Curated annotation (Swiss-Prot):
Its cofactor is Mg(2+). The keyword Zinc-finger does not apply. The keyword Cell division applies. Pfam families: MMR_HSR1 (PF01926). GO terms for cellular component: cytosol. Mg(2+) binds at S41, T63. Residues 26-200 form the EngB-type G domain. This is Probable GTP-binding protein EngB. PROSITE patterns: G_ENGB. Belongs to the TRAFAC class TrmE-Era-EngA-EngB-Septin-like GTPase superfamily. EngB GTPase family.
Amino acid sequence: MSKTIHYQKTHFITSAPDIRHLPEDEGIEVAFAGRSNAGKSSALNRLTNQKSLAKTSKTPGRTQLINLFKVEENCHIVDLPGYGFAQVPLEMKKKWQKSLGEYLQKRQCLQGLVVLMDIRHPLKDIDQQLVFWAVDQNIPVQILLTKADKLKSGARKAQVLKVREAAVDFGGEVEVDAFSSLKGIGVDKLRAKLDEWFAPAFELDDEFIEDLDAE
């Protein structure tokens, strides 16, 4: 029996400059990553039906920390630093890139990665690097083509198909869908994907209860 996850109860736990400052590497984490202007904060707020869970900034590139949110017991969402914004100093870009790579390659409890890309400008070099990193670690990836409301229905579908075809080159488990925080496009599909990734946490709970009942 699948558990209903109440994403609206998601709340902030802590911020960390790198994985060494995160809580214990246990439970299940789903990470969100994307270019600084891809609409990551808006997507997290829409997912959880909260207006300011993830703070949106008028200056892209401000999110320099790894932000951790608790969804349920043993289930967390990780908001990774935005990347690729032109006005950020090169040294800071390198630091963020190292932090992202380190998290994807070393965090054992990472169950899935959501990569957000503006539907009008998808698959930039650093976006692709991020997906390849995840695939190399056998981490499933959900690509969200954000700001889908900016395109008419036909153009939106064509762009999704184009990116799906390109995503075949990544290998691994990579899915592509349109998303709009403003219009709610793709929100239910995103919740369903997160439900799937978080499910093992509740299976462990059920096994624990069964063991207690058997004693």
